[in-house]
């Protein structure tokens, strides 16, 4: 999606399926196709589903091992001859969702579990909640990611999510929790007053703020 300087969309959202074997080469080829559908951009923000440090993708458990230590930011900047910033996808979704007041936690429910923590609008970098041990030595992702949903079914998945929300409030003392990702559509219980579901477009709209918060 193309955004203006205020973070408002000025184009339709474009989507291309992730390659069946999502190696860096295969994904970059699809990103080239996307770039041609969105002409006229002067800079690029990229949300990546894994650990990112200084534009390098460190680990992507749910994508492909070849993304380990891949210089995605530098590669795209050279490929498209534009300034590029790459960040964790949950972090960028958070930029688009938060109100920049107090302690705000963002959790995305999809193939895996993404998470981002903000204090007064500033990102606390490096949070990887999805892989943190939770119950019986298994991680949040084992229970609340796609494999957990497939294993336990929708009813138990909702019970586990409700329990996780209560536990996370004890851990982070958040003022607000934002839930995003495709599996939020499967939530069937009433959320607490300080928890809300946000649109998947927040992951796109937050791309502008990625440039503001990091200079």
Where do the language-model regions lie?
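Glycine-rich phosphate-binding loop plus the immediately following alpha-helix
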Residues: 72-74, 78-90, 123-160
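Short glycine-rich, Thr/Ser-proximal phosphate-binding strand/loop in the N-terminal lobe
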Residues: 1-26, 59, 122-150
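Glycine-rich phosphate-binding loops at beta-strand->alpha-helix junctions
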Residues: 168-200
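Glycine-rich phosphate-binding loop and adjoining helix at the ATP-binding site
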Residues: 12-45, 51-103, 143, 192-208, ...
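Two-metal-ion RNase H-like nuclease active-site motif
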Residues: 104-109
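A short, acidic, amphipathic alpha-helical segment used as a generic capping/interface helix at domain edges
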Residues: 157-170
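Short glycine-rich anion-binding loops that position phosphate/pyrophosphate groups of nucleotides
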Residues: 49-52, 110-114, 183-184
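Short beta-strand scaffold segments in enzyme catalytic cores
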Residues: 1-3, 50, 95, 113-118, ...
């Amino acid at each position: 999606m193309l955004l203006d300087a205020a973070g408002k969309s000025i184009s339709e959202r474009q989507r291309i399926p992730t390659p069946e074997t999502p190696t860096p080469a295969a994904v970059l080829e699809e990103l080239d196709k996307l770039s041609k559908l969105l002409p006229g951009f002067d800079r690029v923000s990229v949300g990546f589903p894994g650990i990112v440090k200084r534009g390098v993708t460190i680990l992507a458990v749910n994508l492909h091992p070849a993304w380990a230590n891949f210089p995605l930011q530098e590669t795209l900047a050279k490929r498209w001859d534009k300034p590029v910033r790459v960040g964790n996808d949950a972090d960028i979704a958070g930029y688009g969702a938060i109100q920049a007041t107090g302690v705000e936690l963002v959790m995305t429910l999809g193939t895996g579990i993404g998470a981002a923590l903000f204090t007064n609008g500033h990102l606390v970098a490096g949070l990887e909640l999805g892989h943190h041990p939770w119950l019986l030595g298994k991680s949040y992702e084992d229970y609340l990611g796609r494999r957990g949903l497939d294993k336990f079914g929708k009813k138990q998945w909702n019970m586990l999510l409700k329990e996780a929300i209560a536990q996370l409030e004890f851990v982070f003392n958040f003022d607000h929790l934002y839930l995003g990702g495709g599996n939020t559509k499967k939530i069937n219980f009433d959320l607490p007053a300080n928890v809300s579901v946000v649109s998947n477009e927040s992951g796109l709209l937050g791309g502008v703020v990625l440039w503001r918060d990091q200079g």
